[in-house]
């Protein structure tokens, strides 16, 4: 368990991105002995392509593959997808059928399982909570890029702080579930499934899940809310999102040193073209280089980092 990473002991890491990164960088590498699932999900008809595969490839190149099981869920068979095939030996493909997966859980038989939404936010919230309840592990959005091994964090359940544009205190912090970790059938996972059907959500809701997480947090504080900068550095450093809103544009230079961060979350710009020289393209090239070096074929079990300055 990482000590001191809470509002009461170290409030400055929740309001100062640079201090949060320094704290994260000081977290020593570790070996988590239990096999851990890493869950991802993508639903067709939305195309699975170059942007989507980077989450998987960065996970493969930063986690200890002897201790993790990387699971790519989809509502269709992705085995013949041209972006999946080159990394297929490192991941497990599963079909996402919410009605079937809900059997034997608190959600079995609910109409919520067949409800669809235009932007896929609500279905994504349902997915992450159900698979973590049923199988345990880590969930990450498909627009998350992994920077380092999550092993030091895996002995605890966690989510992370929703930027710095919200009010933070020991009592109230808006919570982001783009990256989360829960144990199979845990009290937290059970509570979230229990309250999920009763929480109102409109089709245009983007923070329904945050409302749900905050509700459960009022009654159960035995899980960790990490600082935003651990997983979403730019959002914490730039209240108005700044350059992080344009990760695919050429010429958006970053002077940020993300050294210490566990991931980068680039926020849903699926339709934006990837320009050569953009932040995304430069990071993609770094991940591809590391992937090529390691899987021709050496797996380094320790200190699996992508490097220092991910923006430059």
What are these regions (language model features)?
Residues 1-124, 142-312:
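Glycosyltransferase-associated regions of secretory-pathway enzymes
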Residues 125-135:
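Small-residue hinge/turn detector
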Residues 135, 140-141:
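Active-site acidic Asp-centered loop
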